Amino acid sequence: MLDLHSLPSPLRFLSLVALLAAALSLLGAPPTMAQQAAEGVVQSEAGRPAAPGRTGLPLPRFVTLRADEVNLRTGPGTRYPIDWVYRRRGLPVEIVDEFDTWRRIRDWQGTEGWVHQSMVQGQRGILVTGKRHALRRRPEPNAPGVALVDAGVVGVLQRCQVDWCEVTLDSFTGWLPRDAFYGLYPGEAVE
């Protein structure tokens, strides 16, 4: 048996460190980054995914919520707590990151969190913002109105021209100025 007292001080210290490391590995110390990588779960030091799996779709991108209730979680998995519950099918959100089957989304207020991929769909939607707007029959400021639309109304984005977009809100279809709603990037073309 090795007598640690007979070793010089630096070697004694290294021997103690090696023994401590071996003991911790036997006690089930938390997995290292290398162990997590081997299991396909790489996380940064902040606990967020460091190497998310990519679908090949552009990031960020707009999508809509698929269900009437969608749990927004603090991380990509059911083990993470629910931070917020959206209760608005068709609400437009941005996907800003992806990890496995989870999508990090951002809403119109800048709130971010994780939802399962099954809770979003590729259909483009809008959320009317600001004040009351006239939904127009044509993409012109003086065109006849189809309906008056209040802030908070959710609809479907059909297509866009330079300054106007055609949208469907319930049973009404018409044109709104691009700056009247959330759900579209500046200069983005939608056909």
Language-model features: where?
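Generic N-terminal simple sequence motifs
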Residues: S6, L26-L27, G56
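SH3-family beta-barrel domains
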Residues: Q35-T74, V85-R89, V96-F99, R103-T111, ...
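Alpha-helical transmembrane segments
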Residues: P10, L14-V17, Y86
